[in-house]
């Protein structure tokens, strides 16, 4: 376990060093303006999706409930589609209305710092589409400016679609221009460890401007093939992190392969151990197949990790059960 943590920290060092590399999202032109309804439609199909939100503190990724976003622009302003994983959709905290302190509920917070602007803009949207905004950090509710947000609740997620005119942002963007941005999430349904998450790996709070990500405007559209490659590049750090976990699980099991295989074989022949032996055997086989795949997707890696938590510990516990069973037989 210590080895895994060390590898993880090495992977994250570039993000943790103040003033060093920032995360960057390339914001491409939308071919058409999306219909604001919180749903993903054709207008978004060639815009890359980013994920890999960090738990506030910048050292760990959110694993149980991730967040995804797409961001594109047109001459009139910036559009965003943000999707929040939420299997406990009925437990959402989202009642406040426009202008109220939405960051206290299940919500998304957006921070934009346009190039050469004197201050940044802070916007918030809750899971029912209510809006809130301020300039800089005042913490005071304000009458929402002229920007739009619409929410949608699915079976195991909620989403918001947002349009922010350049007039609200204080200036228009141009090709190659870099703004600073933070996209953050307030999660009230648990786990408590993921209460505050954000796309840039911020340390102490969402207003940590010095560690915001870059939003780089690109004055062209993307083909579907280009979109896929850019999406892979954006999410490469999170993908690498998941690969490290999967490889670590495999190494842990292979170290005790002989003992574990023997325990599983024994357990399959015992009625009271058979169910767990089958589970562990199938899990091991599934892990092996996942590793053999040339390029498993990010979602496949994460799904396996979430589906089989505490895997090495379960194998160890089962091994002990088998040893005890054999002792009683004697």
What is each stretch, according to the model?
Residues 10-18:
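Hydrophobic h-region of N-terminal signal peptides that target proteins for export
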Residues 20-330:
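Structural preference for beta-rich elements and adjacent junctions enriched in aromatics
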